[in-house]
Each structure stands twice: as structure tokens, then as C-alpha cells.
Amino acid sequence: MDSLIRHCSEEIALDGSSGCSIDRLWEFAANFFFRQGIVQNLDDNYKTFVWPLILKEDGIEVWIEDEDATGLRSKMQEIPWNYQDITIELRARIRLFASEDRQWLTLTYKTKTDSKIQPLAFELLSCISRYRQEGVDRIQLCKETKQEPRSVYGRIQALEDASLISKVAINRSRAQTALLVLKRFESENSTINETVAQVSGKQIYNTEKIRSNICDAVQSSRNGICRHVDARAMVNLNHSRWERRYYARQVTYLHNNGYLRKCLTFVPNSPERCIRCLQFIKPYISSLDATEDDVDFTEVDDIPEDDELEEEEPLLPSKEEFDASFLQPLADVGPTLPQWSRFRPLEFQCFVLIRNAGFHGVITLQILSGLTGIRFNKPLFKLLGSLVEHRSSVPNHLSHMSITRFEDKTKKSRQYRYFTLQSQLNRLIRDGIPAETISKLLPHVHSLAGEFSPIDSSLFLNSLHHKGNMESNAEVSPDGMTLLPRKRGRPRKSANISVTSSPIRPSKNENNLPSLAISPVSEGFIQNATISTPSTSSNLSIAGSLTPSKTSRIYRGLAPLKNPEFNEDHVKKAEHLEPLLNVSSSVPSKNFTVSSPDHLKYGNTSSLQVSDSQSSIDLDSSFHYPVSVDSQLSHSTGSLMANFSSPTKKRRLESVDFIFLQRKGLILSYLVEQNGAFEISRKMFEDLADLKVRRNPETSRTVMDRRTFQQTLEKLMQEKKVRKLVIATNNGLGKLVRKDIVVQYDMKPDSPRFQQLRAQITTPEIEKQSTPEILKDVDVDFLKRNTSLSRRKSMPAEIKRHKESSETKPVDKEEVKKNEKEKDDPMRLAQQLLESLAPDFALHENTQQKSPVEKPKKLRKDRYASVEEFDYFSSTEHASKRSVKRFKNDFTSDEDETLIRAVVITQIYYGGTNRLIKWEAVQKCFPNRDIYALTRRYLSIRQHTKFKGLQQFLSENWQQMYKDAVSRKDLMPYPDSVDDFDPTPYVKASCRPYMISSSNLATTRLPRDLVDVYETYNIEVVKQETNFREMIFDPSLSVASKMNAYCDMPFTMPLSLNDKQNNEGDENCEKGQLFDAKSTIKSIVAIPDATYDARFSQERLMQYPEDILIAAHQELLDKRIITRVNSENSRLQPGRNFQFTEKFASSLKSPLPPFLLSQAKRFNKFLLEGFQNHKNHLFEETSNSGTLACILDLLSQGKLQISIVGSKFNEYGLSEGYRTRLLEHDNINVTLVLSGKESESKKNYGVTEKLATPPSHEPRLWLNGKCELIEMIWMNIEQSIVYQLLRKPGILRSQLTNLLFPGLEPREFNEVLDYFIAAGAAIEKDGLYLNHNYLFKLT
């Protein structure tokens, strides 16, 4: 029952500030029984029984929500203790909360005042905790807490940094997202696949094994010689900088100790180049046992026994290890309960695991995985740390622990290892710490150190009961898990310092006790001590109130450790302990007994047996009892009792850092090994690690970090064991280097060892570096490396040349000094300031004339900048930045095009491959560019998609264009000599519009058979049931199949402002409205930033009902035509929070299909109305409607012009920056204005910004002379005719004209059709048919 109540109250506290409803409370109870495997009917009678018990639990509050929908809550004044009296309506409104302090302690492990978590972040933490089983994503979190998404993001980061929550990667709706869960429930979460932020679990290297592997790798190579880098790859230390440095340190160690030799070898291909190699000398002899060879890459530790220990250690301790004073008997809680650690004291479980680990200790990760069944729980890890580090919160049974840092060099994280007192004493003796030091330290150890004492029941009762205990002022956490540290700050000045241990009851016969106390000295300690006193034989026993059988049952885990190899080493050190064993001077015989006081009723039987035959002692080092000290014993005798005081004084507890002692012993041993002096260097740290392994082969090899070494050294200096000297020496390269030396405290400056070390340090490093031997005529194997991974970035030629020139140029020291003086000269600075404030314009002009290719200033990278900002080009037009990459001093788009045209035109007549271009002739088009820059630029752009079509078009059509131009006398014939050839006029001629005429129709290709029609022209039959409008952006369909599907589709005009009234009341036009709304949205999205008008966009969109607009937006999003833009600035501007998708933009880039040209007549009507109504943004609205050819027609006739100066359309009808939101400046950022000649002819129009009236006749197709557009359109006309004749035999010429190309003039269409008939492809006889012979050819 108590477990259930505690479980429910814990779950209520975990719900935090969101609270817990009554239904949820019974879910917790049902979950508790289910996990335990207990069948319990949660009916109303049982709930009535449990309800008041839960409400009486400390820190549980009952709140009620208001009846209105505001959701406000208030604390209930009259608590309904009888569950049956609560109505169903009232149950829905009642919420259970834990008190604020308990909420904060449960979720953040700290009180609200001590925690650094903000209250708003705590709200998020409460919400995440509420969904602790299933997880919650960020969007849901924002909705529930009603906080801004940006703020939530930062607070989640803060909670994650505090290791309170964890992100869990999941796949939701085909996209990877993250759920947020409490860190402690990470493994219990039902949606977990892989945590996003995994803890570093990289391997820790076994250095001995690595050194052995390096030697084996070099030995296995040919001739025993291997490249330095190849050996590194063979031992798999090639992944990170740390691994490479680690490998280099080990190679240096092997070289210094004579296992390998560093040498150089000539490369066979280039004899002047040497490479570093390693030569094998002798196999490596490891100082570790052979049993450790298998454990070089263990994840947590290098000790094989730890894995076995984890398997043997049950989740819960056995029943015998509990005491009757513990609140809940074990029978109620089975070992299968996964959430056990939340409702039982962690420290109890920790102790059992640590005690059974013995000498090796247990690492934090093993404690957590062994006890809680979770991977790595940082909050619990912090709890363990606080139990050890904060003296005020250490329970009695944990005060014997100490921590050591365990290195994980891969991620620089800290893991902590926990030890029992017994294993620490064993370590200290093995490490050679003097017995005097140990005896001085032992009195400071807590009185209950060494074994587990029974649980103090006050730890787990409510704090109300605990407040009655006035002798302890430490707070107990509400969940009864641990004692909390006192508040920070300076402690109050008082003589009586309270201790957190359970109060000791005074005894009646306290004054009659003999003067003896058993200290927690380990068996090995006394065992070594008894060797020097073989004659002494005594039997000491202290009988407590517990029987020996119970004692042996509780402490059966302790077994004596035998360390025979240390017996002889510590004979002398053990002599200090002789007085300990001679304390029986006041005892009449060898056997004596001492009765323990009543207040030690929890004590255990401890026996000390010393005999001649066995040098073994069975000592239960559980407690030493603080009793009064005999006056005869003094500190000078070396007794362990000397510093003990009476229990009435309550001496302050001192923590003993055994690890610090170990480190001090290690450094002093190294000092002795180095003859009393050594230098602090990288080698010293490696030697310390090796010495540590030599002293105790069972430990893992870890390198001490500098901070730890510094702290230990400072302690040794305070104790006047060592001195630290600093020497500044010249390293031989003209630089002073600091060297730190550690010497024995009593070493004199004239000591030979000090002089020797000083001479060694002051030797310049250049002299120390012995040049490695160069091996000649030796074959070395080269490992094949993955070139793709190791390929370096090629340096641009300009930078390379600049580097070379700067290296070769000698540095003039005087000139450098002069420049520095000029920089610092105040008059010079003032003059520069004046010049910058008032520049001379005439001077500026002269400098521009002298250096036309001067380096311009750096350009601000602004994608949507207006054209005026692009002032770094020679022409006023700017180039797009997306298609061809341009730098600030690079070619413009016009220069690129001119270069391609000049090269092709020169090549066609004068020949020459790409390598043998007549660059002298091409350079005449670019007087300011050198040939080297032209060749580089040509090589970089000739393969670009933009210019491939241009090169192909010129190579196919230039001969004919050239002949026509020469016959019209527009061009002179090519000169015989290439030296006289200037390609400039020829390049200009190639840019002119070039019309297809009957003269060159013979060269065009007609389809030869039906396969040619379907394959070459990619004709597909479109199924009738397909929704054609949805397929307009389907890239898989060919031009002809789209044309066939769309040739009868009406042209839809965007709704104007005047149409609003006409459409009102028309209920049947919803589909048309949806289509128009989509067109309007697309046209608004296409408006560029420069001409965007929020008011205009809003007016256009407000014509449609809200549901139509939402549906239109959703349909455009579903069809991937537009996508959302996540930007704070554009949220309130209609049209700015969307952009065209890449798929849509790329569909616009395709060549103009014929079906778009069929709408010219309808577009002409629309254009006419638009110009008459003086509509703004006309071009933006129509540019995506497939009417680009019609606008080009008007432009070609000179009726219109575009307002951006020199803006042009490329071969596809769109500019190269089509991928961006606006399809970029050249394409859509334009408005149509009257051309110059039109405005002059109109007398009424004085301003050229007025819109032009369209021409009276229908627009005809204008063919741009650039690239392959002419050929593409010609092929489309051919293809369309063949396809229509196959589809509709006998169609009349007029029908075909209207069906296909109403935008063409009759003369132009008849010319194409006449050629078609003349070529024998069609017959005209009462209608048009495909020629029978031609049809026969096709089939």
C-alpha cells in the first residue's frame, strides 16, 4: 500500500505545473499494479479507501477549475475526503498538484530558489513530463503552453543543456522530427528509435595493445620497413586529429625505447624526395598480463570482470540485506519493476553494487546501467555525485565513498569511479603511502565508513516527522530519496556543527568502556603489518548485540584480498603499525572481550585474529566506534586512536580524498625513479601513466590531465615535499621557452642531478633533433589510399601565382620599417582623412582612364538588390549570380556570350580544336583582357548548359547566316589571313533575329517512320480521363502530348477589380473562382520585391471568399507549385510568405511549347482591355500564363519596351536565375512601357512611363536569333502537323490553321505547310491527308 501511495504521489509531482486529473490518477494506480503483476480491482470501494491516503501525502494539494471555460484554478478550501461524495461534474474539475517545492525538486532536482531554470522553461518541462510516456513534439508544446515558438526553441535548448530532457528521433509523415521526453524516462519511452543526442561511447585505447600492434604492423611489412602513414592506417588510428597525435606519441615511445627506428626512404619515382618510414628492430614486450589482450576496445572500462559483475548483480538486493526498519517489505515489490529506482533510495542500491565490486570499484555508467536499466541518465549521475561531494547531504552508509576521475580522451567527458574504504586502503598500501599518513587520515573517516548501516527510517518518512528531530537541520526531499544540501553561502559560526547521521543515544555504561576502537583497516593492511611481529599472538573480539550468524549473512560479500607480491616491499612500512597490535598491555590474557554499548545496537560482530601459523586476518572493517580515548595513548605512538574525540563534542566530518593520495604517491615515486628531478613535459605524463600500470597491472592505463597534475603538485609543494623551478631557455630558433622542473624539496642547486637536467634542458632543440637515417636501395610497400577522400582542394591559379611571387620576392627590412612609420605618422593619417572626406573628382577620373581594369570594391551579397547596386560591371546590365558563378573581377554575362560566339565563329572558318584556338583574333573583341584570362574563362564556361545550346546553334546555322549576310552586303567575307580577321562585326551579325525562309528548308529533318515520330519527337497519347490542368507541370509529358491536351483549353483571364460585382451572387462559379484564385496567388507570388505592393495584393486577394482562398492555397501547396517561406518579416504581407518550388520553376525553363502559342488571339484581347484600363502589374500577371511569345512579338515590332535598361531574355524565354523566388530581375521584374519611337509619334504622351496601346493586328510569332529556339519551334510546328494529320485525316487547311497557330500570319503558316506538301509528307485533296507513301514509310 505504501508503495502505491508513494508511486501515485511521485507521478503527481512529475506532472508538474499542469497538474493531474482524477481519472489520470487511477491510470497511475492501474499502471502500478500492472507493472507489478498484481491483479487488483480498482472499483469505487477501493478508490474510496485509497483517496484520503493520497490526499494526506505530504505536499499534495487539491485545486478546482472554474465552471466557465477560462480554465482558471483555485485551491479548494474544503477538501472532499470521501470519494463517494464527489459528483461526476466535480471530478472533471478537480486537479491534484504537488506543492511547488516538490514539483521543482522532482523535475529539476533542486528547489525553485536554487535552480537556474526559468519559470517559463519549467512550464515547458512540466508539459514534457506530463507526456513522459509518449513524448511531445515542439509544435504541440507551443500549443499547450501558449508560448512563442522562438522562445520555446531557446528554452528547450536550455533544458537540454541542463540534461533534464532528451530528444528522440522519430519518423512522422515521411519526415524526421524529434519528440521531447524527460531524460530519466528516455528508455521507457514507447516511440524511441534512436536518441538524437547520444552520449559519447567511444572506445578507450589500451596503450600496451596499440604499441604491440604498431610493432607487429611494421614487422609484417616487406623488409621490416613501413611508411609512417601506412602503419597508422594499419592500426586504425587515422580518423581524427586526436588519434593521429596519440599514434605519434606511441611511435615516439617505441623509437626512444629501441623497439622501432624512425628513418627516411627515397621515393622510387622521384629520387630527390624523402618519405618518413619506420624500421622494425625488436618485438614489443608488454608489461601487462596476457589476459588483458582481449580488452583493448571496451566501451566503458578495460577491466573484464566488470561485465561479469553486471550480469551477476541482481536489480534489487536480496531480502537479508534489508532491515526491519525499512518502510516497505520486499514482498510487495518484485524485482521486475522497472521504475524501482524512482521510489526506493538510489544510494542503497549503489552501495550494494560498489561493495561487491571490491578492489576495482564501479564506474558511474555501470552503476546506472546495472541499477536502473537505462543507458546514461545524467540527472541520476548528478545525484550520485552530490551524494559524495556535498558533505552535508551524504547519508551514513555512503560517507565512505570517494571519486576518481576516469579519462575518456575521445570526447573529454568525465566518468567517475566509486570505491569502498577497504579497496582504497588496499590501493594506498600498494601505492606505498606511508602507514603514518594513513593512520593520521583514518580518524577523519566517518564513524560508519566501510560497510552498510541499516536504513535510517527518518530518511523516508515525511518531512513533518523529520522536523521533530531537532538534532539534524538537513532537509529531506519530498520523495524521500536523499537529503538535500543546505543553502549556499558561508556557514553560521557555531561551535556545535550538526551531523547528518542518525542521532546516537547515550549509554549508561559509556564511562566503563575500555580504551579501544577498531578502525576500518583492510585485511591486507594488517596482514602486512603482522609480518614484523611473528611472536605476537592474540585474539581480540568485540561482541555486539547482533549474532555472528546475522553478521556473516549481511556481510558475506567481503572476502580477504591476498597480495603476496607486496609483502616484502612493505615490511618496513608496517613497523609503524606495531603499537597498534601491542595495545593489549592493559589486558591480562591473550583473549579478551569487550561489550558494546546499547546505542550501538546496529553494530556488527568484528573480530581481529592474529596467529603465528597464518599471516591472515579476518577483520570486518565495518565501523570504528567513537569512544573516549585513554590518557595513556598518545599521538607519538602512531596509534590510530590518537585523533579520536569524545562523541559528546560531535567533531566535524572531514572527507578523505584517497585518489589525491594515490596521485601524490605516484608523482613522488616518479620523482624517486628520476633521481629527484624531472621536467614537466608530454613525455612525463606518458611515463606517469606507464608507472601507474607497472605499480598495479590490474588498473587501466590513463594519462593524467594537466589540471589534475597541477593541483596535486601544488599540494605536494604546500607539504614541502617538492619544489618547482622555472627556467627560461633559448630553443635555438631565437625564441625563449619556459621549462618547468620539479625537484625534491631538499635538493641543492649544486646537486649533480640538477646540473645534469639543467644542461639537458638548456641544449637547443635543433641540436637535440637527430636527423633520421636515410635508407637507400630498400623496397618499401605503399598502401593504396582512397584518393577521393584524400583529394585536396585545388588552389586557384591566381592565388598560387601570388603566393609564388610573394615567396620569391625578397623582403626589404628598411622598406618595411618605412611603411610602418608612415602608417603611424599622425600627419599622414590626418592627410588621409582629409583626402577621404573630400576626394578630387578630376583626379578620380584620370585614375580611371589609366587603369580601366582596376580592382573594384567588394560587392555586398544581396540577392534582391536593385540594378543600380551592381556597379562593378563594365556595362550597365548586371549578370545573374546563380547560373554561372561570378566573382567581383570576373566576366559579365555579355562578355561570356561574346567570347563563345567569337570562338565558334573563328573556329568554323579558320579551324583549330579547343586547344588551338586563334586567341589573337578572339582578343580583338576584348581589348582590355589578356589572352591568359580569356583562355581560362572559355575553359570554365564552354561546358555550361547555358552556352552548349548557343555553340550548337552557331555551328549548325552560322554558315547559312553568314551567306545571307554577305549576300545582303551586311558583312565582308572572311579575310584569308587570320591576323587580319576581327570577329567583332561577325559576332554582332550572329545576334540578329534570323528568320526561317524557304531557302534553307531543305536542310531540316522530317520524320522517316512511325518510330521516329514517337521516339524523336517524344509523342505520347494522353488518356481522355486524365485531368489535363493538373498535368501542366508534369515534366514527364512531352511537348506534343501537352499540346494535344491543351489546344482547346480556354485562356483564363485574371479577375480584375471591376469583375467583383459581376461575380457576386453567382453560386455556380465556385470552380471558376478557385481556378482564378490560384492564378491570382501565382501572379502575386511572382511579383518581385522591388515592385511589390502589399495593398494591391491584398485588394486582389480580397475579391475571393476566405474558403476559396484557403482551398486555392492548399491545392497549390499539394501540387508542389508553391511552398512556404519561413520568415518573420513576411508574415503580414500577402504573397511574401510563399515562393515557387524548384519543380515549378524548372517547368517554366523548358522551351516554349506550341500549345501556349495557340492562345495568342485570346491574349491579344486581354492585353487590349488591360491597356485600356491602365492596369498595373500587367506583365507580372501574365508572365506565367504562357504568353511570353506574344510579348516578345510586341517587343520585336518596337511597340513596347521593358523598363529595365537593356534587360533581355535568353534562349528559353526566361532568365538564368529562374530558381529564385521571383524568377529574378531579368525575367519578371519589368513593366511594359511605350518604346521611344511610339512615344514620339503620340503627341499626347509626354512621359514615356505611360502604357502603350497594343497593335491592331494579331501578334505573329517572333523568332529570336539566339541559340536553338528557332529550330525548336520549327520542329514543334512539323511535329504538330504530323500529329494532327494522324489524328484527324481530311482536316481542312483553315481548321488546321485555327487549331494550331492562330498567332502566325497566314503567309508564315502557308509557307511551312506548302513546304510540308512539297516534301511529299502530305497531300491536299478535299482536305489534308498524310501522303500514302509517306504513311507507308512511317508504318
Curated annotation (Swiss-Prot):
One of its GO terms (molecular function) is RNA polymerase III general transcription initiation factor activity. It is found in: Nucleus envelope. One of its GO terms (cellular component) is nucleus. Residues 798-826 have a biased composition (Basic and acidic residues). Its main location: nucleus. Keywords: DNA-binding, Nucleus, Phosphoprotein, Transcription, Transcription regulation. The modification Phosphoserine is found at S595, S596. InterPro entries: Sfc3/Tfc3_C (IPR046488), Tfc3-like (IPR044210), TFIIIC_Bblock-bd (IPR007309). Residues 470-515, 791-826 are annotated as: Disordered. Residues 485-497 bind DNA. This is Transcription factor tau subunit sfc3. It comes from Schizosaccharomyces pombe (strain 972 / ATCC 24843).
